[in-house]
Amino acid sequence: MPFSPQELLYEGKAKRIYRTADPRVYLCQYKDDATAFNAQKRGSIAGKGEVNCTVSSHVFAYLAQQGIPNHFLAQTGPTEMQVRALHILPLEVVVRNRTAGSLCQRLGLEQGLPIEPPLVEFYYKNDALGDPLVTPDHIRLLHLATPEQVEKLGSLALAVNTHLGNFWRRCRLELVDFKLEFGLDEEGQIWLADEISPDTCRLWDLQGTEPRVLDKDLFRFDLGDPAAGYQEVLQRVLQATDPNLPSPAARERGRG
């Protein structure tokens, strides 16, 4: 059953979240807007909303099959999906498989070095503070999550990393790093939320002699045509997955 938007709950840099007639379901609408460096750089990428919505739908469906609880219910339009209503934790969880981006800048590391085991980092979602890196002790001090929740977030992030790495390899891409967000349901259970797309994953095509960027770094660092890069990721996802996504009834399941 489709759910029409009833009330705008939140508008962020890349998405709008609406209430629906069912209090358990939100409608998530993806935008073409693009930002980088904590919104210091702004623009748009043609077709980004549709790419990110469709890619996220496929990835969330795949992760659900692997036993990762997530908020996705169904894609209801090119740029819209139904999601489980959650209270989003004010944390970003970043998993790094290779050195890249801010990690290299912060620690003076060469880009592209493998990280084994993968590195898990937590960032406080606060635009005014520039989304700072925080430790579990900082999280406890700020009452952002309980120690038990932090431990669960870390273990879930590593599990997602394993399955997500397999998914992107099927698309002939390497998962360099990525960020996740999580939310709590009314019973306090943790669910993977937000999106998983070229906006949130650093993806390198390693088929050539040099890694080729196919993610938001195309926009962030003016490395090429972002719209073309995003469309290529979408086509690879469609080629690598079953296009028939599960229905909301099939997706609605408990944590067990």
Curated annotation (Swiss-Prot):
Q: In which pathway does it act?
A: Purine metabolism; IMP biosynthesis via de novo pathway; 5-amino-1-(5-phospho-D-ribosyl)imidazole-4-carboxamide from 5-amino-1-(5-phospho-D-ribosyl)imidazole-4-carboxylate: step 1/2
* A GO MF term: phosphoribosylaminoimidazolesuccinocarboxamide synthase activity
Q: State the encoding gene.
A: purC
Catalytic function, reaction form: 5-amino-1-(5-phospho-D-ribosyl)imidazole-4-carboxylate + L-aspartate + ATP = (2S)-2-[5-amino-1-(5-phospho-beta-D-ribosyl)imidazole-4-carboxamido]succinate + ADP + phosphate + 2 H(+)
Q: Keywords on this record?
A: ATP-binding, Ligase, Nucleotide-binding, Purine biosynthesis
**Gene3D superfamilies under this entry?**
ATP-grasp fold, B domain (3.30.470.20), Phosphorylase Kinase, domain 1 (3.30.200.20)
* NCBIfam families documented for this protein: purC (TIGR00081)
Q: Which PROSITE patterns match?
A: SAICAR_SYNTHETASE_1, SAICAR_SYNTHETASE_2
Protein name (record) = Phosphoribosylaminoimidazole-succinocarboxamide synthase
An example GO biological process term is:
cobalamin biosynthetic process
The EC designation for this entry is 6.3.2.6
Query: Hey, which family's this protein in?
Result: Belongs to the SAICAR synthetase family.
Protease as a keyword of this entry, yes or no, is no
* PANTHER family to which the protein is assigned, alphabetical: MULTIFUNCTIONAL PROTEIN ADE2 (PTHR43599), SI:DKEY-6E2.2 (PTHR43599:SF3)
